[in-house]
């Protein structure tokens, strides 16, 4: 079975594709903003209650009731007795508030892998372990926490990053499974109307806004049977076996993509999107004529690239120089028409016809420096331009520069 791509594991769109859903969201927006402000005030009281009351069944019940006012509804299967659940809870990662949701139905603590220790880390409900410099220090701190009498179970997310939960699970890290020979897996699904439950790469503040803005969000928790390590089973094998079990319960694939693959994909996507949709610069009729002059001299350069550079320079000579010296990259029109591989090339890959392509017979030509070749290319293009347009182009350049 072919494993899903990294892109399919992520939620990249906040808003729905259907026009009807977009219209409903637009009509709901005024009510949603009012609801957000009211819930923000109520949420402050929920935070105070969670700080004042000690961890108990009554506190969790009260917080669940108050959370329902915030539009957060939690349903779960029959809760297993504490002695059968174990000290390590393993869950898939859907949103930035998964640890808060699960703590409403079971006593547990979750360490943060990204939030720096301090007030914000404590206020978000994470377990503070001090400044952690490495994964080894984290594991030592967690082992010390587990050895303390009266300490609650640890809730860990081996995926380490959130996913859409629709197609697959990220590859489980092995370090959570080195803490104990028995773990308690549980699965989490999230449903929300009108918008996505969470968008990959967004901050937790943005997700909090949408949590309070949308009418309701339903979290469903399902407890799975405890899993014990087999004899001579390594941490990696143990982690993969639990991953397959949880993926089967969710009806998704257990992939080999890691959190680092997810981060790399999001980084590449952020850099590629602006490049794929460049903003067009409006040109005057004079600049349009100047672009045609450049096109006559450099026929391989597409007009879109010429327009873009002329919008910045306003000068024919400067634009020609930019293309000849490789300051502006473009896709030559000969490649586009021929259907060859669509990769960006610098003009020096194409506009080199005035000079011999093979091994020159003359020693002088063979020893031309790169700068001399550029100057030769520039002079050739300039000569072709002057032969075609003479002083007319110079006048239009001056008009364009004054405009």
UniProtKB/Swiss-Prot annotation:
Residues 22-42 dip into the membrane without crossing it. Residues 1-21, 43-399 are cytoplasmic. One of its GO terms (molecular function) is ubiquitin binding. It is a peripheral membrane protein. It comes from the Eukaryota. Pfam families: CUE (PF02845). This is Lipid droplet-regulating VLDL assembly factor AUP1. It comes from Xenopus tropicalis (Western clawed frog). The gene is aup1.
